[in-house]
Amino acid sequence: MSLPERPGGISSEHRNAYRQSQSRRHRPADIEASSYYPVEGGRSSRHQPGLSANSFAETIPSPNNSFVENMPLSPTGERPAAPDQPFQRKRSLIRPERNRIDKDHPNYHYRKHAANMSTMPSATGNDPIAEDIEATTDVSGSRSQTLDGVSDTSPPRGHGSRPNSGEQEKKAPRSSAKRVSRHKSGKITKSTKKRSTPQEVIRPPSFWNVYCAIITFWCPDFMLKCFGMRSRAEQRAWREKMGLISLILLIMGCVGFITFGFTAVVCGSPPLRMRVNKVSDGYMIFHGTAYDLTRSGHPPAEGIPVPRGQRGANILWGMPGVDNRGKDGSFLFQNVNGRCKGLIEAAPNSEVPTNANGDLAWYFPCTTFNQDGKSEPNFTTPYYTGYSCHTSEKSRNAFYIDLKKSADVYFTWDDIKNSSRNLIVYSGNVLDLDLLHWFDSRQVTIPQRFEELRDTNTAANKAFRGRDVTRPFQSNGDKEIAECFEEIIKVGSIDTVTVGCIASRVVLYVFLALILSVVGSRFVLALIFQWFISRNYAAAKTSQSSDKRKRNQQIEDWSNDIYQAPARITGDIGSSVVTSDRSSKRGSTFMTTSRFSTVYGPDRGSSNKRVPTTMASSGGSGSQLLHPNSMYRQGNDSRSSFLRSDPYASNVPPSDGPGPAGFIHEAVVPQPPADWMPYGFPLAHTICLVTAYSEGAMGIRTTFDSIATTDYPNSHKVIIAICDGIIKGHGEEMATPDYVLAMMKDQTMAPEDVQPFSYVAVASGSKRHNMAKVYCGFYDYGAKSAIPVDKQQRVPMMLVVKCGTPDEATKSKPGNRGKRDSQIILMSFLQKIMFDERMTELEYEMFNGLWKVTGISPDFYECVLMVDADTKVFPDSLTHMLSAMVKDPEIMGLCGETKIANKRDSWVSAIQVFEYFISHHLAKSFESVFGGVTCLPGCFCMYRIKAPKGAQNYWVPILANPDVVEHYSENVVDTLHKKNLLLLGEDRYLSTLMLRTFPKRKQVFVPQAVCKTTVPDTFMVLLSQRRRWINSTIHNLMELVLVRDLCGTFCFSMQFIVFVELMGTLVLPAAIAFTFYVVIMSIVSKPVQVIPLILLALILGLPAVLIVITAHSWSYLVWMMIYLFSLPVWNFVLPVYAFWKFDDFSWGDTRKTAGETTKKAGLEYEGEFDSSKITMKRWAEFERERRSKANYWGSKENVVGGGNSWSMPPGHQYHDDYYSDA
């Protein structure tokens, strides 16, 4: 894979400046999707990192490149030697060219950019290896779809002598003579529009669409039309919503079945069981089963009178002279003539009745005995022989048929092994061998084996007593005897668990262990991150207090009011940081500085510690942000130029020509040396992006004040505000862009002279064409600012106002395309700078505007801080965030903690305080250990634009990566899944895209970076906000769960955590319902379900432990209690409402504008996109055209800055005291 070059590096490849997006192949009229072919004799652009001094391949000869051409704007050409060591790729088991790269590959679009670069011939004379470009890059198969008049062309260029130039002229692109520039093409003709219309391709319905159709078969389209869903898009969204709800209900049902139903199915309802010796007096035992005889009545018999008024005497306590309560009456109803037939026979002269078949009437004396086995044999017979033996058919039917058993009597193994009992276990039945002593030898004869087993002194008895004899009895021929014993001496059953109950317990404990491991690991790893890992990201020193507890208290006090200023507002970076260093208590007695010392402090370059790489430090000397021969040079090519008293002294009079250097603002903040590190790390240039919609003046002012007064040097930060249309907030006097424009001063151009420029918006239909104005200047704190005048720093600022096309000037919300479009304006701009691609007029103006107010090329910016217009940043937050970015190049995105400023406004805002706290310090801290924070809040986060790669001055795009920009700028949003991703949760989707594209890089949470914001204080606004957040969370987790390259493996992976989080989000309503059920059942029923209660206590109690251990404010314990009482709202009301509103893509009541009742989704755009209205050229072509219009084709001095002809006026100073101690 080709890598963009870092300034000062080599460029081994070149490319054709066109993009062919697979995701946009169905949009042939898309100006950005159309191919670009240079005319004959033209040269393909270079694969450079951007439009820095070393990357203007069309304009400036770069002495660090291997192949340099003579450019029309540069009459000189240099060819220095290339670096000795080329970039070496890491070893891999799979060769990169053998990887299958399809449209689903995370680096698909980036590989296309790399594959589209043409390779220049080698200087050795060897012919390059020609590859089939058509086969490798034209994935969509529509390369010839470029419209005449749509693809812009470069004018013919002159070339110096180089190998095979004649062959290249012969291989010029076909039909290049027919292509004309866009400004000459005019409007697109009808035939052209007809050819550009994408043909509808009939595809078979997907499985998901079929499933949704089956689920909603009962509601045909005409019924949906009756309920207001007239368009097919609305009907399809509703059907997909019902399909998703059905899956959610199915998942909830599965969770409920596993929680409550699985045990009942596989284990069943076990019968009532009673342990031996604990059978109550209301029961009587027969053959190991207890019967409730409290309401029994014995029919009249000899010796058993019938009490008056009753049907019979009670068997338990009504028998004369006998108390049967809790006793064993197995001998009263003996199982005879079964499996014991042939083993037990009548003795000679026996009184036991028998018949011709040898059947006996009874075996034992018909009496009762104690359940503890301590009764002695009793052979006395009252009244008559066979008394109480119940041998009649009526009495036996009354027992075996009519009497219902109440409970099983069970023995534990401790009972079996009791030395006072003579018990064995066979097939789960407990047999009492002592009952064999009740055989009357005068009445029956028994086998010798019976006598061996009952005698405790025999070897057989000692071998089997207290054990399970199932296997030995079945193997040694005693099976017949054992089965006989089961009928006559069974006293109960062993305490065993069925296979189904064992399985249910295994499942229960597996899920319990899983939940406990997830909850416990989240808690432990969150603590590890808070205590050990997070401190590595923070800056060593800032303008705020270094004491952690004191700083936390300052932050809590600061976050109580949205408009409250911090305890300490940082002033000039030179004074705030250097002074704090010199005021150290351990100061040296001897002088450490002199009048010759640099104002930037001690030299950091003498340290042997490896310094992290930044764009400014990668140039070698560390101080040259501009190329010595750059047309942007200011006469300050060395580090000493910052300290000269008259750095712009020149014998040549200044020029007021139209070159970019002639328009650099006189008050631009100077650039310090790259080795100046006031916070202990190299400074990286960053863009502070503020997206505004309908915010008021007060909210915008405090946001800009907080960013402008951050202690990060102003030379390395710039504020870019993008207003999403001409929108007037509800109750506001002016439109939001007017408020922002009033907060700028020293503008490079009068506001009334600023013209709108076209760009390609993220929309569909005619809305795809949009226009915006670019205002450049410096931030104006205002006359009544709360910031002291001596603390007001000069911060460069650029305002982009999306004003819309003239056709929508009279419509509501002109220029409004959404927050995602605002972000794409910057992301696409950064991508085109890094790859030196064709850009729109708006992007060209943005480039020049940034140059004018910062004095450096935009490709030097490495990070983007994204802040909403209602968010206030703590003074040292930006420093901590950039410290993490610089110290760990693998970090591609991070976020800070968001505090709530209106905690006590209402109960709605109060219940959100602790929810915000645990979402950061528990969830994001845990995810940061894996480097996979799944959601970087759009109100306060930072992304890396590009990252250093290797040690050969190479940079790879991160946020500016074509795959990220291409997917994030998707405008064909035709499914419910895409609409929830791109219309409701664009900020979270950007985090998902970054993780999906770069699964091996990190997204972390930096707790030292803090901001504050206002949250909804009415329930309807909260309901609308959380509907969007919950739905976007579900669909983003669906995307992330498919990424297999995230950190970890199987259950110990980030992918598994994402899956658990997805399932947990889907079953929130069922979970809270189950929780209340378990609590209520534990109160009203016995026995108490201990395990679920312990689990519930752990889940709800661990956050409180986190508060105590991490030493946060004790007030959060109160906020936690408020949060616990509001759990039904969080886990039931909000998710259920969000699920039912899956097909609602509006923003509801979150942020209304003047004259608006409810925010619409804004999905259906009419009209066709006319790409001829948008001009796209490379920067050099725009610059050449601008200069040609100005008729400024001067001498060599005017082109390359010879003689400092483009220097600033002699009176302009570089403000050396800006970084001094004064």
Curated annotation (Swiss-Prot):
- InterPro entries to which the protein is assigned, alphabetical: Chitin_synth, CHS4-like_dom, Cyt_B5-like_heme/steroid-bd, Nucleotide-diphossugar_trans
- Note the topology in the membrane: Multi-pass membrane protein
Record GO biological process = ascospore wall assembly; chitin biosynthetic process; protein localization to bud neck
Q: Where in the cell is it found?
A: Cell membrane
> Which phenotype arises from disrupting this gene?
Significantly impairs conidiation. Impairs penetration in host plants and exhibits a significant reduced pathogenicity in Arabidopsis and cotton plants.
Q: What are the cysteine partners in each disulfide bond?
A: none
Q: What is this protein called?
A: Chitin synthase 4
Name of the gene this protein is made from: CHS4
